[in-house]
Amino acid sequence: FKLALIATAICLLVGYPVSYLLSREGERFRRTAMVLIMLPMWMNFLLRTYSWMTILENNGLLNQLFQHLGIISLYNRLTGSELEYFTMIDTQGAVVLGMVYNYLPFMILPIYSVIIKLDHSLLEAARDLGANSVTVFRKVVLPLSLPGVLSGITMVFVPSVSTFAISRMLGGGTELLLGDLIERQFLGGAYNPQLGAAISLVMMLVVVVCMLVMNRFGEGEEQAVML
C-alpha cells in the first residue's frame, strides 16, 4: 500500500495544479494540452513501461546522460565512491515513477472536468464580497472540486495497488503489491485460488465504497451550492 499511496499523493500534488492552471487558459491551449496529456495513453501500457526500463537501466539513457554531464564523476568525488552508474532500476523509486507516469492522466482528467464546469458567478460573487484570489480558491474552488479529487484518487490508487506489471518490470519483483499477491495465488507457486478470489473481492468492495463516498460527497456539494 505504501508505494500506491506515495504514487497517488504525487499524482494529486502534480495533477491538481495542472488541472487548475489549464482551466484558466484559453480553449485552444486547453485542447492542445489535453491532447498532449492523453497522447501517452494511446500507447500500449506494457510498451510505456518498457520505455522506462530502457531509460532507467544501468546502461540506459539517463545514466548515459549523467555520465556525459559528469554528474556521476562529481558524485564520486564528493562522496569518495567509485560508482559507474546510478542504480535506478529495480528500486521503489522506479516503481513509483512508473505508477505516476501511467496513472497521472487519471488524476488530471476528473479534476479538470469538475473545475472547468464550476459556476463562474460563484467566483465573481466571492470577489465582489472582498475575497482575494487565495480566499476564492480556498473557500470556493477547492471545496467544489473535491468530488473530482476523490474520483482521481480512486482512479489512481486502485490500479496502483493492484498492478503487477510495473512492480515486476521496474521493481524487479522485489516490491510486492496486491496485484502480485493475487497473481501468485492463481499462477505462482503458492497456488491458492480461494485466497486470490478473496483478495480480489476485497479490492472490489474498496472500489464500491469509494464510489459510494464520491456520490454522497457530490450530492452534498450540490446541495451546498444550491443553498
Give residue ranges: language-model regions.
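Periplasmic/extracellular loop-to-transmembrane helix junction in inner-membrane transport proteins
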Residues: 1-9, 25, 84, 184-191
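Hydrophobic alpha-helical transmembrane segments of multipass integral membrane proteins
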Residues: 2-14, 18, 43, 138, ...
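Transmembrane-helix boundary motif in ABC transporter permease subunits
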Residues: 6-38, 53-54, 121-123, 141, ...
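Membrane-helix interface segments
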Residues: 25-33, 91, 121, 133, ...
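Transmembrane alpha-helices
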Residues: 39, 101, 106-121, 127, ...
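Membrane-interfacial helix termini and adjacent extracytoplasmic/periplasmic loops
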Residues: 49-100, 134, 170-174
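C-terminal transmembrane helix and the adjacent membrane-cytosol boundary/short C-terminal tail
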Residues: 112-123, 127, 197-227
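Interhelical loop and adjacent transmembrane-helix boundary motif
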Residues: 168-219
